[in-house]
């Protein structure tokens, strides 16, 4: 009986000692992302490369619900006009431009050989400033050299958000892509690897 009472007192003291370390005035290490109001619309794309792009995806930071995708873009035509994909629903993006937002773009390309065909990704892709009240949807523009630019078309006269103007090679919002080793392993040729 005395042993049970002693054990009960020890357990109670341990529990109380654990609570003594909590202080309400200390800052928490948990960071809650700020809530961003999102718009939703079609995602479209243009392909200025000589390769067929089967599909692409756009993803925002975890927990933001920003993302979408599209696909089936023919290669650039002989006259220099880009291959395009029609609108694919639904891309979610911030209603107001977020200067610190960085996105990841992945795309599956057929370069007519086994070594360089497959998934590519560009990380930390920025979207140029846009007017969310005049949105013409999100565009992914694929450029030679495994590069990509994202934009929210808004009729901006400076050309940074105009789909009528091919992004220049010195455009600061163009991101470099690299082969995506993880997705090339998980989804060879765009199909999920079977678990045996």
Question: What do these predicted regions represent?
Answer:
Residues 58-111:
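Tryptophan-paired
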Residues 1-9:
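Bacterial N-terminal signal peptides that target proteins for export
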Residues 15-18:
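C-terminal motif of bacterial Sec signal peptides marking the signal peptidase cleavage site
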Residues 30-61:
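Short, surface-exposed binding/anchoring microloops in extracellular/periplasmic proteins
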